[in-house]
Amino acid sequence: MEWVEIDGSYGEGGGQILRTAVALSVITGKPVRIHRIRANRPNPGLRPQHLHGILALKELSNARVKGAKVGSTVLEFVPGRAEPKHVKVPIKTAGSITLVLQALLPAMAFIGGSFEITGGTDVPWSPPVDYLRNVTLFALEKMGLRAEIELKRRGHYPKGGGLVTGSVEPWESKKPLVALEWNKVDSFAGISHATNLPAHVAERQAKSAEERLREFFNAPVEIETEVSRSLGPGSGIVVWAETDSLRLAGDALGKRGKPAEVVGREAAEELIEQLTPRKAVDRFLGDQLIPFLAFAGGEIGVAEITNHLVTNVWVVERFLGRTFEVEGEIGEPGVVRVVRKAEV
């Protein structure tokens, strides 16, 4: 058996290497061995939140897995016969639902299936669920991929308890994505939420974001507010720009002692920063699209070439050979081009 060998400490050196590598193992049918997992981190090895994505992909592909335990620095994943199924992922804590989806979505695109994931929907260090639903899926649909993500209940740090369900149809017609620059912003939209908190929190976040965006752009702004109940309190906001190309976004989370006005303004300022280079893809979407672009083809202009993006390109090319050309330095705007489209 020939392994694809991956150094888990390369580049960004975190959970993303695991998510992308195991997803590509499922897609290509190639077994993968990842060693030196998170070797440069204060607490090396697999963390609980990484296991959820790995085990979900194990179930989807009937894989044989060795080393899938907390603290393990080596993981061996041998995919079996993948078939569409309903995958349940119960994250007992506020572990990120969207990071599990970053592993599941590319794999399910080639197989089909549905999912039900409990955990954190709006938690630090991961994209909020409203980002995936409104920005990521919007771009994937342009590439011919049909997927649905439904938010049933919010989950915040530390209690979690969020619930997300959805499905992915097998990706039959892959369309190249050419999205280099935007020429005009048609409008702004967003979702501002408050969970187990007064409605005025969501309203103030939305108002503050809207005011900030209007200082820079003369375009309509429509941010909806959502008030709900869950296991614990929390708030957040995602705002996105509808451009003549794709959607770009900014987001922010509330926390105790942080005024709602500051939360709203932070999200708006992050979005303005993403729009400034006039590239079609924001820095967060850039790295998420890499596994899909490899099979669909195309080229994208990104507001910032991140370490995550470069690391994702490296992982994909371990499986598929040279696929991409990246123009631009880390921390700067740039272009990612597919030079050789992969077939499965």
UniProtKB/Swiss-Prot annotation:
Record-listed E.C. numbers: 6.5.1.4
Pfam families: RTC, RTC_insert
Keyword set includes Nucleotidyltransferase: no
Keywords associated with the record: ATP-binding, Cytoplasm, Ligase, Nucleotide-binding
NCBIfam families listed in its UniProt record: RNA_3prim_cycl (TIGR03399)
Residues the record marks as active site: H308 (tele-amp-histidine intermediate)
Protein name: RNA 3'-terminal phosphate cyclase
A molecular-function term among this protein's GO annotations: RNA-3'-phosphate cyclase activity
Compartment list: Cytoplasm
GO-annotated cellular components: cytoplasm
Family: Belongs to the RNA 3'-terminal cyclase family. Type 1 subfamily.
Catalytic reactions of this protein: a 3'-end 3'-phospho-ribonucleotide-RNA + ATP = a 3'-end 2',3'-cyclophospho-ribonucleotide-RNA + AMP + diphosphate
PANTHER family xref list: RNA 3' TERMINAL PHOSPHATE CYCLASE, RNA 3'-TERMINAL PHOSPHATE CYCLASE
Role summary: Catalyzes the conversion of 3'-phosphate to a 2',3'-cyclic phosphodiester at the end of RNA. The mechanism of action of the enzyme occurs in 3 steps: (A) adenylation of the enzyme by ATP; (B) transfer of adenylate to an RNA-N3'P to produce RNA-N3'PP5'A; (C) and attack of the adjacent 2'-hydroxyl on the 3'-phosphorus in the diester linkage to produce the cyclic end product. The biological role of this enzyme is unknown but it is likely to function in some aspects of cellular RNA processing.
Keyword Nucleotide-binding recorded: yes
GO biological process per UniProt: RNA processing
Residues annotated to bind ATP: Q102, F284, L285, G286, D287, Q288
InterPro entries: RNA3'-term_phos_cycl_insert (IPR013791), RNA3'_phos_cyclase_dom (IPR023797), RNA3'_phos_cyclase_dom_sf (IPR037136), RNA3'_term_phos_cyc (IPR000228), RNA3'_term_phos_cyc_type_1 (IPR017770), RNA3'_term_phos_cycl-like_CS (IPR020719), RNA3'P_cycl/enolpyr_Trfase_a/b (IPR013792), RPTC_insert (IPR036553)
